[in-house]
């Protein structure tokens, strides 16, 4: 049985990150709000409150987490664009997933995600090759170039969408 935590595998990229790859990743980030909305379409409240795996987050928490994570990423990009290798602040995503706003209707986060991604994608398409080399420093994972971060967050959106779609497949929803 495959690892339900990583339905599309973990993020890895080896090789040169070309303009074509960057464009593909940005397109995936742009598509995420619609893909995530499609993944949860017609789910009822009980289904939204079903964990995607034993010990995992509920579908509702996954949707809210994606927005939390991508808001943080958007800020990290802006920091890297305006400061030299800023040290970003990590957050405890597992604790954020337990906060009261993670019980709100998923539509709240879908609207936020759509608006956030419109702004983020606009910023991403404006990046010049030199901008893609800019970095931020994560206290736990170290220095990250913006080019690689684009790939990581494209993967992140697909990863969590796959949590939901694979659950739907397993349970015949």
UniProtKB/Swiss-Prot annotation:
GO cellular component terms? cytoplasm
Q: How is the cofactor bound?
A: Binds 1 zinc ion per subunit.
Please tell me where Zn(2+) binds in this chain.
65, 156, 160
Q: GO molecular function: any one?
A: hydrolase activity
Q: What is its subcellular localisation? A: Cytoplasm
Listed Pfam families: DinB_2
- Fetch the Gene3D superfamilies from UniProt: dinb family like domain
Key words, A-Z: Cytoplasm, Hydrolase, Metal-binding, Zinc
- Name the needed cofactors: Zn(2+)
Q: What is its EC number?
A: 3.-.-.-
InterPro entries registered for this protein in UniProt: DinB-like (IPR024775), DinB/YfiT-like (IPR034660), Put_metal_dep_hydrolase_YfiT (IPR023774)
- Signal peptide residues are none
Kindly report the protein's main subcellular placement as a broad class: cytoplasm
Q: What does this protein do?
A: Possible metal-dependent hydrolase.
NCBIfam families from the entry? PRK13291.1 (NF009807)
Instruction: Describe, as the record does, how this protein assembles with itself and its partners.
Output: Homodimer.
Q: Which family does it belong to?
A: Belongs to the metal hydrolase YfiT family.
From the Swiss-Prot or TrEMBL record, give the protein name.
Putative metal-dependent hydrolase BcerKBAB4_2443
The taxonomy runs: Bacteria, Bacillati, Bacillota, Bacilli, Bacillales
């Amino acid at each position: 049985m495959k690892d339900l935590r990583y339905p599309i595998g973990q993020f890895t990229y080896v090789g040169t990150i070309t303009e074509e790859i960057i464009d593909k990743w940005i397109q995936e980030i742009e598509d995420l709000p619609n893909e995530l909305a499609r993944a949860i379409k017609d789910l009822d409240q009980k289904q939204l409150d079903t964990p995607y795996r034993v010990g995992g987050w509920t579908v509702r928490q996954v949707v809210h987490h994606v927005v939390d994570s991508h808001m943080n990423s958007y800020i990290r990009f802006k920091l890297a664009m305006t400061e030299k290798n800023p040290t970003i602040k990590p957050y405890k995503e597992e604790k954020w997933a337990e906060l009261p706003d993670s019980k709100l209707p998923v539509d709240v986060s879908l609207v936020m995600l759509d608006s956030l991604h419109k702004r983020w994608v606009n910023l991403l398409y404006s990046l010049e090759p030199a901008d893609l080399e800019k970095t931020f420093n994560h206290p736990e994972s170290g220095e990250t170039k913006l080019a690689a971060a684009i790939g990581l967050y494209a993967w992140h959106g697909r990863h969590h969408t796959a949590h939901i779609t694979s659950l739907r497949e397993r349970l015949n929803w």
